[in-house]
From Swiss-Prot:
PANTHER family: LARGE RIBOSOMAL SUBUNIT PROTEIN BL19M, RIBOSOMAL PROTEIN L19. Belongs to the bacterial ribosomal protein bL19 family. Keywords: Ribonucleoprotein, Ribosomal protein. This is Large ribosomal subunit protein bL19. GO terms for biological process: translation. SUPFAM superfamilies: Translation proteins SH3-like domain. This protein is located at the 30S-50S ribosomal subunit interface and may play a role in the structure and function of the aminoacyl-tRNA binding site. The lineage of its organism: Bacteria, Pseudomonadati, Pseudomonadota, Betaproteobacteria, Burkholderiales. GO terms for cellular component: cytosolic large ribosomal subunit. GO terms for molecular function: structural constituent of ribosome. HAMAP family: Ribosomal_bL19.
Length: 129
């Protein structure tokens, strides 16, 4: 591991020490709590939508969340290790076969729905008679 990678790993450990990042993937519906400063007031703003892309690049990792607001599509890119992100909560797991869901930009209504990923069923081993 070279020096830059080592420094990036230390920075990731420092930034993620006080908060836990859940594992999520494209297709999942997430609620991202964003710290917003308005004048002297600081508050947390929730942004809920579908993760359409995830970019894993160490300290430069990011993800794009898309939602429909007042009939208009809104996308927001978040840096995974940004101090502006207060929390990430996974509301629903999506079952998709693509890493990037940019095709959802062209779709609306029922065609833009994503199937829910159901937890795997445990098969009980029955002894043969």
């Amino acid at each position: 591991m070279n020096l830059i990678e080592k420094i990036e790993q230390e920075e990731i450990a420092r930034l993620s020490a006080n908060k836990t990042l859940p594992s999520f993937a494209p297709g999942d519906t997430v609620v991202v709590g964003v710290n917003v400063v308005e004048g002297a007031r600081k508050r947390t703003q929730a942004f809920e939508g579908v993760v359409i892309a995830k970019r894993n690049r160490g300290l430069n990792s990011s993800f794009i969340v898309r939602k429909i607001s007042s009939g208009e599509g809104v996308e927001r890119t978040f840096q995974t290790y940004s101090p502006l992100i207060a929390s990430i909560e996974v509301k629903r797991r999506g079952d998709v076969r693509r890493a990037k869901l940019y095709y959802l930009r062209d779709r609306s209504g029922k065609s833009a729905r994503i199937k829910e990923k159901l937890p795997a069923r445990k098969v009980a081993a029955t002894p043969a008679a």
